[in-house]
From Swiss-Prot:
NCBIfam families hit by this protein: PRK04034.1
Originating gene: rps8
A Gene Ontology molecular function term of the record: rRNA binding
One Pfam family in the UniProt entry: Ribosomal_S8
Chain ranges passing through the membrane: none
One record GO biological process: translation
A cellular component term, taken from the record's GO annotations: ribonucleoprotein complex
Keyword hit for Cytoplasm: no
Superkingdom of this protein's organism: Archaea
Keyword entries, A-Z: Ribonucleoprotein, Ribosomal protein, RNA-binding, rRNA-binding
The protein's name in its UniProt record: Small ribosomal subunit protein uS8
Subunit and partners: Part of the 30S ribosomal subunit.
Stated role: One of the primary rRNA binding proteins, it binds directly to 16S rRNA central domain where it helps coordinate assembly of the platform of the 30S subunit.
Amino acid sequence: MSLMDPLADALTNIRNNELQVKDSCVISPASKLIGEVLSTMQKENYIGNFEYIDDNRAGQFKVELEGNINKCGVIKPRHAVKKDEFEKFEKRYLPAKNFGILIVTTPEGIMTHYEAKERGIGGRLLAYMY
């Protein structure tokens, strides 16, 4: 298996384990980006706790699943979004208004599109989930 996009592989792993109604999953390899995305998902109650496991290679994340994810995935290409353009991408990737989140990387860190709208900053879209 080739790892061209570790974030896409991580979200696919989470989605597949959610569909199989499993309690937890292991994401490998670990990275700072995946850790930040997982912490954003945890703040929004899509997943439970997660922990980093050092396996003397690339590391792993063990994620507790809550069963709250219907669908999740990465957004490719990583669209640059201005602070007033989020609604266009909400219509494209989310099923209804105020249902689900877009995960955005901004100069202030990784956050949901709701937080980015409140702060009045733009960024690049990484992922969606609902």
